[in-house]
A protein has these predicted regions:
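Active-site core of metal-dependent hydrolases
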Residues: 154, 158-280
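Divalent metal-dependent hydrolysis catalytic cores, especially in the metallo-beta-lactamase
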Residues: 60, 75-104, 120-133, 160-172, ...
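Acidic, glycine-enriched loop/beta-strand segments at the rims
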Residues: 8-19, 266-267, 324-332, 341-373
């Protein structure tokens, strides 16, 4: 498939004098003067924008399929997310028993090792539990929380630590330093979240090797003028990528704008943190074995606690421009390149030879037109 006459986002700019060839799920060639191969389909994009596929580093579920359900659900998530323009994602776990966690990590490994065509790539697990603070549990179940230890991590993963790409943890817990250092040594990205840490403890965790903050502002100590908490460190420490849920529900618009001004187009990471109702109508659903009610784009436990989102990555991208005042160039990076960089995923989040499909197509004013590839 040869793509012509579009505005392709390459190297942080939109380029119009470019042709891009897609084949077998990847970009296979790029040049200004590419001629079609014999029998090759040629698509005239008529000036539409073409962006890299999205990378979602924090997503629990989609359209009724939940990571914690296992392999079949994760594969179906991958197929359906591809159609929404997602090139890669991290199936994200909830706090659960050791046996259930081990089962899900094994399922994620099987999907990683046997990817399907026309399905988003699973790049590993985002373990959002169990090394969390009971004070900031959010929708995670406290009865499964543990203090961090490498031995517990080996048990939870069945020894397959490389199936885990990111682990969220509270850095103020006992033995956190030893765990963070060991995880970083083994190429696992430590994300600070569900934590009652102080500003100083977050900076210290970055010194130990933490590189990310999980859904900044949510389920963590708040920012105040004398105790800036987790957000204070997240927004000022250049070593840290900062996830955020830009759905207009989890965060006040100005809180997102502050994050974007502080982290810029280099370190802000859009996520969905979506649960199984994403892409489905309002109603009664579940997250981590807990009942969730979805009404008007809000997913809440029965006690009113927010329980993930119903956000799509393409909506997160559009919100960055329409709601939070970002340029198209910045919005693209925050939804593609930055998430990929924050988890060390080469070959994703950019348009280049070897990059994975799908690409996404957008019309005037960035109206969604679907996927390419």
């Amino acid at each position: 498939m040869l793509l012509r006459n579009g505005l392709f986002f390459v190297d942080d700019h939109f380029w119009e004098k470019l042709c891009v060839r897609l084949g077998t799920g990847r970009v296979t060639a790029m040049d200004e003067g590419l001629a079609p191969l014999a029998g090759e389909a040629v698509i005239d994009l008529q000036g539409d924008f073409v962006l890299p596929g999205f990378v979602d580093a924090h997503i629990h579920a989609f359209r009724g399929h939940d990571t914690m359900q296992g392999e079949d659900a994760i594969r179906q998530m991958a197929r359906e997310l591809y159609q929404e323009g997602v090139a890669a994602f991290l199936p994200t776990t909830m706090s659960a028993s050791v046996e259930d966690t081990r089962r899900v990590i094994a399922a994620i490994r099987r999907v990683m090792d046997t990817p399907e065509q026309r399905a988003a790539r699973v790049l590993g697990a985002h373990m959002e539990a169990p090394f969390l603070s009971p004070e900031k549990a959010g929708a995670q179940r406290k009865e499964f929380f543990l203090h961090p230890s490498w031995e517990a991590f080996l048990d939870l993963t069945g020894g397959d630590i490389q199936a885990v790409r990111v682990i969220t943890m509270a850095p103020e817990l006992p033995s956190a330093e030893a765990f963070i250092r060991k995880a970083a040594e083994n190429g696992i990205h430590v994300s600070i979240g569900h934590t009652a840490a102080t500003d100083e403890q977050v900076h210290q965790a970055a010194e130990w090797g933490a590189t990310r903050v999980t859904h900044t502002y949510n389920a963590q100590t708040p920012f105040t003028h004398r105790a800036p908490g987790v957000p204070g460190a997240a927004l000022t420490d250049d070593r840290l990528f900062a996830e955020f849920i830009g759905d207009g529900v989890h965060l006040h618009d100005d809180a997102v704008k502050v994050l974007l001004r502080c982290k810029g187009a280099d370190k802000a990471v859009a996520i969905t943190d979506s649960m199984e109702a994403a892409g489905l109508p309002d109603g009664e659903y579940a997250l981590g074995g807990q009942a969730v009610t979805v009404r008007g784009h809000e997913a809440r436990l029965h006690d009113g606690t927010l329980a993930g989102s119903v956000l799509l990555m393409r909506q997160a991208f559009q919100n960055l421009m329409a709601r939070y005042g970002q340029t198209p160039e910045a919005a693209v990076r925050i939804c593609t390149e930055n998430p990929a960089r924050s988890i060390g995923a080469s070959g994703f989040g950019t348009i280049c030879v070897g990059a994975n499909a799908p690409l996404t197509r957008w019309g005037k004013d960035f109206a969604w037109k679907g996927i390419l590839g």
